[in-house]
Amino acid sequence: MVKAVVLVKSPKKLIAARLKQVSLVNESFSVSGQFDAVAIIEVNELTQIKDVTIEIQKIAGVERTETMIQVQ
């Protein structure tokens, strides 16, 4: 399993709830600071992280994302 954290910038207030609807997003919540929400994803293959991130970027109102992949 590969875990990653995706930080999401979006003015939409319900972005964290919308992130939960994305396939392979295990958890999401709103945060304060430079980003507005965090999505925790778990995938079997490293290449799937890109697919999930692209899906998140397609959500209306998402301005930018930053992804951090767990290192072992």
Regions inferred by a protein language model and the residue ranges of each:
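A compositional/biophysical signature of low hydrophobicity enriched in polar/charged and small residues
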Residues: M1-Q72
